């Protein structure tokens, strides 16, 4: 499929052909959802922790004698049923990450790109270069292109002035092409690709 290439000033700068093997798939929500769950599980901190009965600071002595009181049998006050006792089966520090095959991860990215193209939410920009590191000027250019909520993917490296100017614009994320991922594609309204990013993606998936 051919898309018109734009400049940051909003002018046409030719056309680019997008590979159907990357951008032309019928999006599968189940695969995209699997990749998003994998990403979010991997970034989850897992620092949750509660103290069990072996860790709470209370006496370990038997509360009262076993027989003759008419009351229920108990050992120490650390037991979970008592106020101040340890938590039974409480959270522990752990990693929430789980495995996902590389083929599924790659397929999920292609389906996310295809979903964006199907929704007509992909814009290809000729070159992501700013003459000066001025947020106001770049924000105006983005507004004229309708980029109020966007993920911008550049080449292997983001040009310095562009990176500095863009980093303070709300709801706009800028990543090099090696940082492209399913979750960030979906959480932003528009996906902006530089020509270098398109070439890198086609090289990656060929």
Swiss-Prot record:
It comes from the Bacteria. GO terms for cellular component: ribonucleoprotein complex; ribosome. One of its GO terms (molecular function) is rRNA binding. This is Large ribosomal subunit protein uL4. Keywords: Ribonucleoprotein, Ribosomal protein, RNA-binding, rRNA-binding. HAMAP family: Ribosomal_uL4_B. One of the primary rRNA binding proteins, this protein initially binds near the 5'-end of the 23S rRNA. It is important during the early stages of 50S assembly. It makes multiple contacts with different domains of the 23S rRNA in the assembled 50S subunit and ribosome. Residues 63-93 are annotated as: Disordered. It comes from Rhizobium meliloti (strain 1021) (Ensifer meliloti). InterPro entries: Ribosomal_uL4, Ribosomal_uL4-like, Ribosomal_uL4_dom_sf. One of its GO terms (biological process) is translation. Belongs to the universal ribosomal protein uL4 family. The gene is rplD. Part of the 50S ribosomal subunit. Residues 64-77 have a biased composition (Basic residues).
């Amino acid at each position: 499929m051919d898309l018109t290439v734009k400049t940051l000033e909003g002018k046409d700068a030719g056309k680019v052909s997008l590979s159907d093997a990357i951008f032309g798939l019928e999006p599968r929500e189940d695969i995209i959802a699997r990749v998003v769950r994998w990403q979010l599980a991997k970034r989850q901190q897992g620092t949750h922790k509660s103290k069990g009965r072996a860790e709470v600071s209370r006496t370990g002595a038997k509360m009262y004698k076993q027989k003759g009181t008419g009351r229920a049998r108990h050992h120490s006050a650390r037991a979970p049923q008592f106020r101040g006792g340890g938590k039974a089966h409480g959270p522990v520090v752990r990693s929430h990450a789980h495995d996902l095959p590389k083929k599924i991860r790659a397929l999920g990215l292609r389906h996310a790109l295809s979903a964006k193209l199907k929704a007509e939410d992909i814009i290809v920009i000729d070159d992501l270069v700013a003459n000066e590191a001025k947020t106001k000027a770049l924000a105006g250019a983005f507004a004229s292109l309708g980029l109020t909520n966007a993920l911008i993917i550049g080449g292997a490296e983001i040009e310095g002035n562009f990176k500095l100017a863009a980093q303070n614009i709300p709801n706009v994320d800028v990543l090099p092409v090696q940082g492209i991922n399913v979750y960030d594609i979906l959480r932003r309204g528009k996906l902006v690709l530089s020509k270098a990013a398109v070439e890198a993606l086609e090289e990656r998936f060929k």
